[in-house]
Amino acid sequence: MEHKAPLVEFLGLTFNLSDMLMITITSLIVFIIAVAATRSLQLRPTGMQNFMEWVFDFVRGIINSTMDWQTGGRFLTLGVTLIMYVFVANMLGLPFSVHVNGELWWKSPTADATVTLTLAVMVVGLTHYYGVKMKGASDYLRDYTRPVAWLFPLKIIEEFANTLTLGLRLFGNIYAGEILLGLLASLGTHYGVLGAVGAAIPMMVWQAFSIFVGTIQAFIFTMLTMVYMAHKVSHDH
């Protein structure tokens, strides 16, 4: 069943209250995890600190696979923030959804193309910013005409394509997962006991698969961000 989004108008702009709520909740969860993992740092990490150090090592590996550490080390915090934020955002809509008066309030924020495309624009914008900052404006602009000048239009198209695919890939995977979970839940509620029994196992299987997909998508989003960053800031690209 399709549910409306809770929208409000303010100063001629339309705001999706569900997106705003879920973005805030995602940010709070990531912040709480970060604080819990760094409150009492120890030489021998345990618990949350051990988990956070594993995340840092994992993202460090992503960066090292795309650019040299001297160049990419400054993006470690960005990568850790991205992978944690996208992962948490992908997971929020899996256990349940909340509908009030036909409006969908609780969902994964990344199941909305507006959110994922905004994230994509932000990270691609950052790659351009650091490209200019680290290479200088003239050298950065010359990259669009290398190795030959007639590639310039294609490279402009590539920038738009990278932004669209980065955002829409994440949206499509998460949105499709939540739609199927909603259909299975409807089967369980509309067809009595038999429907509930018949939907239970597929729901559990699909939720497990959605956790896997959400994790992979967080990795892909972070990896592609670092790939795009390497293309802009590394002198050998």
Swiss-Prot record:
Membrane topology designation: Multi-pass membrane protein
Main localization (coarse): membrane
InterPro entries, alphabetized: ATP_syn_F0_a_bact/chloroplast, ATP_synth_F0_asu, ATP_synth_F0_asu_AS, F0_ATP_A_sf
Subcellular location: Cell membrane
Residues that span the membrane, as ranges: 17-37, 75-95, 112-132, 179-201, 214-234
SUPFAM superfamilies in the cross-refs: F1F0 ATP synthase subunit A
GO CC, one annotated term: proton-transporting ATP synthase complex
GO molecular function, one term: proton-transporting ATP synthase activity, rotational mechanism
Subunit structure, interactors included: F-type ATPases have 2 components, CF(1) - the catalytic core - and CF(0) - the membrane proton channel. CF(1) has five subunits: alpha(3), beta(3), gamma(1), delta(1), epsilon(1). CF(0) has three main subunits: a(1), b(2) and c(9-12). The alpha and beta chains form an alternating ring which encloses part of the gamma chain. CF(1) is attached to CF(0) by a central stalk formed by the gamma and epsilon chains, while a peripheral stalk is formed by the delta and b chains.
Database matches in HAMAP family: ATP_synth_a_bact (MF_01393)
Homology family: Belongs to the ATPase A chain family.
Name of protein: ATP synthase subunit a
Lineage: Bacteria, Bacillati, Bacillota, Bacilli, Bacillales
Gene name linked to the record: atpB
